[in-house]
Amino acid sequence: MSIHIEAKQGEIADKILLPGDPLRAQYIAETFLEGATCYNRVRGMLGFTGTYKGHRISVQGTGMGVPSISIYVNELIQSYGVQTLIRVGTCGAIQKDVNVRDVILAMSASTDSNMNRLTFRGRDYAPTAHFDLLRTAYEVGVEKGLKLKVGNVFTADMFYNDQPDWETWARYGVLAVEMETAALYTLAAKFGRKALSVLTVSDHILTGEETTAQERQTTFNEMIEVALETAIRVG
């Protein structure tokens, strides 16, 4: 057991999907995994382990934001030995050629969070996806006929921001905004693990188009299928 996860040793697979929403974790377990059992209910942050195409896979809710995902990634790696971590979440598009429901593979993540500035003493660090996962996810998406977007995302510390300045990030090619990827990639690098974020565009910051809360919780299956297939293909 760790502070925030009550699983016993061996109950969590070495490959795990990380949705922010614990109810999405439950949806993934019930919809895609065989024989799924719940190993964590602490703070309502549900975690499950089952099998996908015969491969053992876990799925763990992380909550929203850098501090929350950092807690779960640290404990999953240090207390349970997880090797491969794939975030499956939502993001807001800031490019005109990115549409609601598009799937984005986050190659890298810019951020306004001070986590890395504190870690690296004021210097910049470039949080980056693991190449094997990124390449495999792209190949899986192409096989499924998806129009994937691959590029930089922006990990924001604030959801409600009075001075967001998305225009600057968009001008430099950032595809979308979310709240966790920079932390995931940094911690994976620190501990020598593999990490990737597979994101579905849930809303468009430029146009105002958005999906419903129910859709965010129980749809977006293409993203989940890409993540699961990627997890079982990469050793």
Swiss-Prot record:
An annotated GO BP: purine nucleoside catabolic process
Keyword annotations of the record: Glycosyltransferase, Transferase
Active-site residues, Swiss-Prot/TrEMBL: 203 (proton donor)
Keyword Glycosyltransferase: yes
PROSITE patterns per record: PNP_UDP_1
Similarity section: Belongs to the PNP/UDP phosphorylase family.
Official protein name in the record: Purine nucleoside phosphorylase DeoD-type
Gene behind this protein: deoD
